[in-house]
Regions:
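Aliphatic-rich helix starts adjacent to a transmembrane/signal segment
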Residues: 4, 30-47
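Extracellular/periplasmic head regions of type IV pilus-like filament subunits
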Residues: 52-142, 148-151, 158, 168-171
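Gly/Ser/Thr-rich helix-start
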Residues: 8, 143, 153
């Protein structure tokens, strides 16, 4: 009588595992590059949103630009927007989600956003601001550094923290 063999041999299983590892070695770096590109696109979009929110804040409250990122955030509960909680950006971008207070730093999509009121007059009116977007983990969450100010121009640098002298972002 002949013995019937069922299942896979060890060699067949090793070949399947090797093929899966080769496919993973090709796919994972592409996936990471895609994630970096998505984070960088999100950072640029967030800077555009913050620039628009700052102009809206200045026009709406007639007090210049906001003193903090938190002032651009949503009002607590169902309260109406006020100068300290204008409701122009979400709680993540305003920093409220991280600190539960008026923040000058927030984090979103692998980037840290640092807000700095740059020029204040005698009445306390903020006439200029700077926002820096830096990767939380350079090379992993993003490779470019971004900067914007009250001019609305977004600038980038791929080697160091961006500033007003760096080249503007194309598009």
């Amino acid at each position: 009588m002949k013995k019937i063999s069922r299942g896979f041999s060890l060699i067949e299983l090793l070949i399947v595992v090797a093929i899966i590892l080769i496919i993973a070695a090709i796919a994972i770096p592409n996936l990471l590059r895609s994630r970096i590109a998505a984070n960088q696109a999100s950072a640029v979009g967030s800077l555009r949103t913050l620039n628009t929110a700052e102009v809206t804040y200045a026009v709406t409250y007639n007090t210049g630009f906001s003193p903090t990122l938190g002032d651009l955030g949503p009002p607590p509960g169902t309260n109406a927007p006020v100068a300290t909680a204008a409701g122009l950006v979400d709680e993540v971008l305003s920093g409220w989600a991280q600190s539960q207070s008026a923040a000058t730093v927030s984090a979103k999509s692998g980037y840290k956003f640092t807000y700095s009121p740059a020029a204040t007059d005698m009445t306390g009116r903020v006439n200029a601001y700077q926002i820096y977007a830096t990767p939380i983990s350079p090379g992993t969450t993003g490779t470019n550094y971004y900067f914007t100010d009250q001019s609305g121009v977004i600038r980038q640098n791929s080697t160091a923290i961006a500033g007003s002298s760096d080249s503007p972002l194309a598009g």
